[in-house]
Amino acid sequence: MNNIVHKLKTLVLNEAFGGVLLIVCTLLALLVQNGSFSEHYREFLNLKVGFSVGEFELNKPFLLWINDGLISIFFFAIGLELKKEFLHGDFKNPKNIVLPFMAALGGILIPAMLFVLVNIGDAYTLKGWAIPTATDTAFALAILMMCGKHIPSSLKIFLLSLAIFDDVGAILIIAIFYTTKLSIVAFVVAGIAILAMLVLNILGITRKSFYFICSVILWISVLKSGVHATLAGIITAFFIPMQTKNGEAFLEEIYESLKFWLAFVILPLFAFANAGVNLSNIDIGAIFSGVSVGIFLGLFVGKQAGVFLFSYLAIRFKFAALPQGSNLKQLYGVCILTGIGFTMSLFIDGLAYEVSDIFNYADNLAILIASFCSGIWGFIYLKFFATRS
């Protein structure tokens, strides 16, 4: 019996299994949204959930709690893993930071340029220039893990690091170009929460409840500030101490405790909530419109080209080095996966066009097709063409 339990636990925490679960939830969402349960699916996502304390009230649809709340925990876990790398891993050398930064920069500039070139002259369509700049880290990482053990773990760290810079870029883009109103008061409260965690860290305090309270205050204030709330998860991770005063692992313990919830609850729920695109509303004839072509070229061509080009230049001119144990073929394979914009691109699309159906949902279809092509081609390339030699 114990052997069976051990095998089940190993399966659940296996990252490849997590990737399969994400794909299953994605297909399930598409089936439900386009089947007889579509009305219940939408009601579930639009269900208002919240609380109030005095005059303060936070009452949002369940979809927001998933996208801004639960997924913040995912980015918190990413932040924890990155902190380990910065302090005790490859990123202890500042030179190793250059590569993911340059890769993310190329992955933002080139897709945006392609979209603008295709849609130049159409002011309204150009509002969506940032759609192909996004990467759905959860899906990209899941597919990378499904490629097997012949892919070096350093490439996983590279993708995660790239994702952080990519997400910061996305947050800045949203804050500057897609935010109508920023709250200074909320920013001040966020600053106080960050300062409190800094003090806790300096004093070496390792009471989880203290960090939890500060992180909740930070998350709410960032949410209210008008900036995407997932940034709170990354910021919180950077203030978690590596170990207790007695030398016991503190950060590692928190990270390990999150693995089950990430694999079995958070990421599958995120996929199920965001993948439900109503295919019946899509006008196939509009798939060759400027917005659709711009999105497809930006994600499937621009992302991999931009990320790889800027990475190659950084390596060629010796500003950076290849991730340990990897080669250019494997690096290019990871670059392909960055074209999986999926949920993040759908999110920015909703901000850019204010959830309008002016394009008959052809923009949504373009995101799905480009993400699907990037995922399939990236998996095939990494699995069968990219080798260590």
Swiss-Prot record:
InterPro entries: Na/H_antiporter_dom_sf (IPR023171), NhaA (IPR004670). The keyword Hydrolase does not apply. GO terms for biological process: regulation of pH. It is a multi-pass membrane protein. Keywords: Antiport, Cell inner membrane, Cell membrane, Ion transport, Membrane, Sodium, Sodium transport, Transmembrane, Transmembrane helix, Transport. Belongs to the NhaA Na(+)/H(+) (TC 2.A.33) antiporter family. NCBIfam families: NhaA, PRK09560.1, PRK09561.1. Na(+)/H(+) antiporter that extrudes sodium in exchange for external protons. This is Na(+)/H(+) antiporter NhaA 1. It comes from Campylobacter jejuni subsp. jejuni serotype O:23/36 (strain 81-176).
